[in-house]
Curated annotation (Swiss-Prot):
Cell wall formation. Residues 104-303 form the ATP-grasp domain. It comes from Bordetella avium (strain 197N). It is found in: Cytoplasm. Its cofactor is Mg(2+); Mn(2+). Binds 2 magnesium or manganese ions per subunit. The keyword RNA-binding does not apply. Pathway: Cell wall biogenesis; peptidoglycan biosynthesis. One of its GO terms (molecular function) is D-alanine-D-alanine ligase activity. This is D-alanine--D-alanine ligase. The lineage of its organism: Bacteria, Pseudomonadati, Pseudomonadota, Betaproteobacteria, Burkholderiales. Its EC number is 6.3.2.4.
Amino acid sequence: MTQRFGKVGVLYGGRSAEREVSLMSGAGVHEALRSAGVDAHLFDTGLQDLTALEAAGFERVFIALHGRFGEDGAIQGALELLNIPYTGSGVTASALAMDKIMTKRVWLQHGLPTPAFEEIDSDTELRRVPDRLGLPLILKPPHEGSTVGITKVAACADMEQAYAAASHFDEVVLAEQFVRGRELTVALLGSGRNARALPVIEIVAPDGNYDYQNKYFTDVTQYFCPADLPVGVAEQIEKIAVQAYRALGCEGWGRADFILDGQNQPWLLEMNTSPGMTSHSLVPMAARAVGMSYAELCVAILADASCKLRAPARANG
C-alpha cells in the first residue's frame, strides 16, 4: 500500500518561531512513515532551497512545518507551482487559518461562536481597550502559534508591555475577550463532506498556564481524551469544529481549539492547519482514542496529499 506514495519528503524545521517544535514533529513523522514502509526523507526548509525538492525527485510531501512559511500558504503556493502533492490545507485556507483575525471574521460570518475581539496597533489607545473587552483579556500576535507572544492582561497598566510582546511578531495585534473555562481541542481529518472530528480532548495545565514550555517540554500538563463531558455537549463541540474547519476551506487534517465556559457554551479560539506531531501532541492522542496508531495516522494524512489548484481550461482559437 505504502509503495504507491513513491519518494516522500517530510518538510520540517523552517524559519518560523516554532522551528524547534517543527524539528520534533518532523522527526516523529519521518520515523513513523519509515516504520510503515514509506520511502520518507527529511527535508529542512530552513536549510535547503525548495527547488531541491523537484531535483530530489519527491513525488509527494508531508508538511510538518509550523508557523510562518509553513502553514500560512507560502509553502503551499510553492508546492503548487512545483506540482508536488502535499498534505493539509491549500493556499487560501492555510493563509486564512494562519491569520487569527481573519479566521474569527470568517467564523462570525458563518454564525460560529468566538470571543469578542479588536485589532490594535501602535495608534490604538491601549488603556481604552479593556473598557470594551473587559479584564482580564488576551493579547496575541495573529500569525503565530504554540502560544508564542501571547499575554493574559490582568490590569490596564500591563497593556503596553503585553502589546510590545505581541507586536514583536506582528504590527497589528489581536486583543481578545478572556473566557474563563475549560480548555478543549478537537482534531479533524478529511476534507469537505468527508471531514470528521476525533474525540474532544481536555487540557488541564498547572494554574491554567498552557504555555510553550508546558506544551512541549514538561509532563505536568494533564490530558483527558475523550474529555469528561455530557454526550450532548461533546457532540455539539465536534459539530462546531467541523463547521469551523469547513468554513475556512480546510483539507486533510487540522485541529480546532476551544474554551468551554461555565454554561457549557463552547467558544472557538483558533484553527491549526498543521498541528504538532510530537510525543506531546494532541492529534496523535485523539487518533489513539479511536484505535489509530501514530504510524497509521501519518499514513492516512499522507494518503490525502494533493495539489489543490486546478489549471484553467485553455480557450480554443
